[in-house]
Amino acid sequence: YEMLRSLVGSEMCIRDSSNGVDTKYFSAASDTELNPKFISGWLDKENNAVSDYLVFAKSVLRIPEAHEMIARYTVLDEEAKRLILLRPYQIHAIEAIRDASKTGKSGFVWHTTGSGKTLTSYKATRNLLMDIPAIDKAIFLIDRKDLDTQTTMAFQAYANNDLIDVDETDNVFDLKKKLKSDDRQVIVTTIQKLQRLITRKLQEGTPEYHKIKNLKIAFVVDECHRAVTPGTKREIERFFGNSLWYGFTGTPRFAENPYPQMGDLPRTTQELYGDCLHKYTIQNAIHDNAVLGFQVEHNGPKNKKDETDSNLYVTESHMLKVLEVILNKSYYKLGFQNGKGKTYEGLLTTSSIQLAQKYYDLLKMVKEGKTTLKIDEKIKQVLPDFPKFAITYSVTENEEGSHVNQQKMQESLDDYNKMC
């Protein structure tokens, strides 16, 4: 059977539909506006599907849950001119942050890339300010200038019909002015501006120094695995003694991929921020069709475990074998049979920036004929200049090794400009 129920709050309308076997919810829209990708099924906190309509009704449609869905977990996007309903994993993450904040605990959220972290972090930041009267400011920290404007625009589009103010910071002096203000507000700024403020632009012992230092602040950190290094976070925490920290990341640091050893500084995301409050991994997202899936092909002997020594994967001999498969044994996969101008492009992803740089340098050597790997003549007949390649990665100013990364990026940009 078909069940359709509307919940009306102000001018907002949420609908759910069930056939008794499966249940979905979505925001009200005309037939021409209803997009299947905005129709969500409910998940529990462990990301297990909830299809039974009675269980769904108890989780979402009861009072006060229905009121909270409308008041807390909908966003009127001013730019897109539509009502956005948060997905279950976004709601569970925000609730987990709220619960942690009530007991004065920090933590991090592990949500995969492409799962809507900007919207989740906006609502989390907004709700921290709305729910906890003791918090003076909620600061959303990002690690790049270009993201500063981009994120602020997204936040302001979400906040246009909300009860809070979202302000960006033009410079360090603007950040200081907003922190000195008595207004309770969400501030979007970069880690560089904040660090410069507390280390160079405040004179100890002055009234403004004490006012800013004594603020009760909730920090929400975008891309927390890289945005704030352990040393920088400790420096900021020592200045802002009354602070809570909530990080968002799609790639947490674990014991297997820790931060470099720097004295007694934390080396994993958990050590740096606290417990993982909620997770929604790439496996969950692919299962829910929230992101593009993968066609996986394994190259290597069957029924054999991976090498336990990960250093074997970064040797030149292994990397050349990887490139041999990509460059010489992917003739049909790359569409060379279609002829010049009809071939496909590919993307090689690596486990680190350093490994990407090594592959880039090795590809340059292959192209210059300085390795044992030679491009097959059959391929060169179609594309004589094969392979043409470039490299991209995020260059930050506040990570260990950032100077080397910036230098290598400049070299690769010079290569790219010559190629063009």
Name every feature range the model reports, one short phrase each.
Residues 310-420:
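Conserved C-terminal RecA-like helicase domain
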